[in-house]
């Protein structure tokens, strides 16, 4: 005898006689009926629900397979998905954790009202959600897209972790098999040398153990387990401002330069290096060396790190603040005598 859950309430067909029969529900009223009844009753357009006392207008394309046996659970899951697809703000969009928790509580209150509220409360809340969805459509779409990307990332990470665990398991099995083979080979080698060699038994045993230890060490290097985690790049919201680290001293740049490099300086240390063939092969030039020395000497003059930080926080620059202007024109050096000790690393 079939249970009531296996009988279509419309056509009274039984799953006992038709094992392939599928039951469908419509989110409008969640009344169950078989797939054949849906095809037969709703083939020509929307029709009133055939259940006694239900006046909901149903459409064929809204029917779906019932996942949960309890219709109340099925309804709650659908309502929750609907509400959270619209009210989908993220924690980083709130100033404090309390604000985010209040937002989550509002979502739960909305779900409870749609499930257990009066008809007027449900209608009012439905209109409110529809108005919010219309007003924040672009934001909702962006958050849903970001959530899908994060779900995809988590799935990829989980799949990768499974592959790594499987690979590590196979590698451990292979390592264990190789260790057993080496152990048996060492025993055979020990017996063979004891039978054929004239050396002392203790020295033979030590030599065999050393050989086995070398093989074991080499095998351990070859069978290193793969890491069980990977640095996955988290999906982040796109921003017009590049997320680059802050570097002081005007972004490691000094524009305009506070010096001019002359063609010649009286320097007895660096000048001989220009005639060294080893330095010439590496692209060494006197002017480049002098420019580097002067840059190090003048680097950071007129730059206020605190001013740069303030400009960075206020968004007035891209991490590069204009240094404090100290003179109208760059400093011109009239062939100073620069005594710098340079040690060649070549």
UniProtKB/Swiss-Prot annotation:
Subcellular location: Nucleus
One MF annotation (Gene Ontology) recorded for this entry: zinc ion binding
Region feature (Disordered): 314-346
Classification lineage: Eukaryota, Fungi, Dikarya, Ascomycota, Saccharomycotina
A Gene Ontology biological process term: DNA repair
Function: Acts as a component of the general transcription and DNA repair factor IIH (TFIIH or factor B), which is essential for both basal and activated transcription, and is involved in nucleotide excision repair (NER) of damaged DNA. TFIIH as CTD kinase activity and DNA-dependent ATPase activity, and is essential for polymerase II transcription.
Gene that encodes the chain: TFB3
Listed PANTHER family: CDK-ACTIVATING KINASE ASSEMBLY FACTOR MAT1
Keyword entries, A-Z: Metal-binding, Nucleus, Transcription, Transcription regulation, Zinc, Zinc-finger
RING-type zinc finger segments: 8-53
InterPro entries noted in UniProt: Cdk-activating_kinase_MAT1_cen, MAT1/Tfb3, Znf_RING, Znf_RING/FYVE/PHD, Znf_RING_CS
Record protein name field: RNA polymerase II transcription factor B subunit 3
A cellular component term, taken from the record's GO annotations: transcription factor TFIIK complex
Pfam families: MAT1, zf-C3HC4_5
Biased composition (Basic and acidic residues): 325-335
């Amino acid at each position: 005898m079939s249970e009531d859950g296996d009988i279509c309430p419309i056509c009274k067909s039984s799953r006992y006689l038709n094992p392939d029969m599928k039951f469908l529900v419509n989110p409008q009223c969640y009344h169950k009926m078989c797939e054949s009844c849906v095809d037969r009753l709703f083939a020509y357009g929307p029709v009133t629900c055939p259940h006694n006392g239900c006046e909901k207008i149903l459409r064929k394309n809204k029917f779906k397979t019932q996942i949960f046996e309890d219709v109340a659970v099925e309804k709650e899951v659908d309502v929750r998905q609907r509400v959270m697809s619209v009210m989908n703000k993220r924690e980083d969009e709130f100033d404090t954790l309390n604000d985010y928790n209040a937002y989550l509580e509002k979502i739960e209150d909305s779900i409870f009202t749609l499930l257990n509220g009066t008809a007027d409360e449900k209608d009012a809340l439905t209109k409110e959600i529809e108005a919010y969805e219309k007003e924040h459509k672009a934001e909702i779409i962006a958050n849903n897209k970001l959530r899908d990307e994060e779900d995809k990332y988590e799935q990829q990470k989980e799949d990768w972790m499974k592959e790594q665990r499987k690979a590590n398991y196979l590698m451990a099995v292979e390592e264990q098999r190789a260790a057993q083979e080496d152990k048996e080979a060492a025993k055979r080698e020990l017996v063979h040398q004891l039978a054929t060699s004239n050396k002392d038994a203790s020295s033979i045993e030590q030599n065999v153990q050393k050989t086995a230890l070398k093989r074991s060490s080499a095998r351990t290097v070859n069978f290193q387990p793969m890491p069980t985690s990977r640095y996955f790049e988290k999906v982040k919201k796109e921003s017009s401002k590049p997320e680059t680290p802050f570097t002081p001293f005007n972004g490691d740049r000094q524009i305009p330069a506070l010096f001019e490099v002359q063609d010649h300086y009286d320097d007895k240390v660096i000048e001989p290096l220009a005639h060294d063939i080893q330095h010439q092969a590496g692209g060494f030039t006197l002017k480049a060396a002098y420019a580097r020395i002067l840059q190090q000497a003048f680097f950071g003059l007129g730059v206020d790190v605190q001013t740069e930080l303030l400009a960075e926080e206020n968004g007035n620059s891209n991490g590069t603040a204009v240094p404090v202007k100290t003179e109208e024109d760059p400093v011109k050096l009239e062939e100073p005598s620069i005594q710098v000790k340079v040690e060649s690393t070549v």
